[in-house]
Amino acid sequence: GLGDVYKRQGYEGLSFTCGDIAGYEGVDQVDMVVTLHACDTATDYALAKAVGWGAKVILSVPCCQHELNGQMENELMGPVFQYGLIKERMAALYTDAIRAQVLEHMGYRTQILEFIDMEHTPKNILIRAVKQGSPRNNINELRKIVGFLQVRPMLVQLLAPEAYTFRDCLL
């Protein structure tokens, strides 16, 4: 099984657990968190856990970014958002850009990279975040993007709720 593989490679301290990341409480601190195709907001919960655990490195390959697709509204973007496929793809890109901004707000140097050629899978975005220590003061940028799109992304709710103005809380 998988346990034998990682033991043969010298990773005896590595463990695997099957379950819902949102409720996982098995560790207090980690060096690195890797997520691969955690669907929709599962990526957000995994990123929030990674930040909470003080992960020095986060490597995340998001998948199925449906959350914003159902929330995005903007009169100026209406002519674009009327096309479901375009709106879906833009929602995925906005989701990952917002995730990167939140991680920077939490003190990570963040990059969004293509990690595999498009011919293999369209889900080829890697969010790479390395802990820098000092948070980036980008709350106004976060406020602008969530306000522009009229969205409440899960990762913002979990790690940067101050990005919402008082008026937003009344919605």
What is the predicted function of each stretch?
Residues L2-Y6:
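Short, small-residue-biased leader/transition segments that mark boundaries at the very start
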Residues K7-L171:
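Class I S-adenosyl-L-methionine
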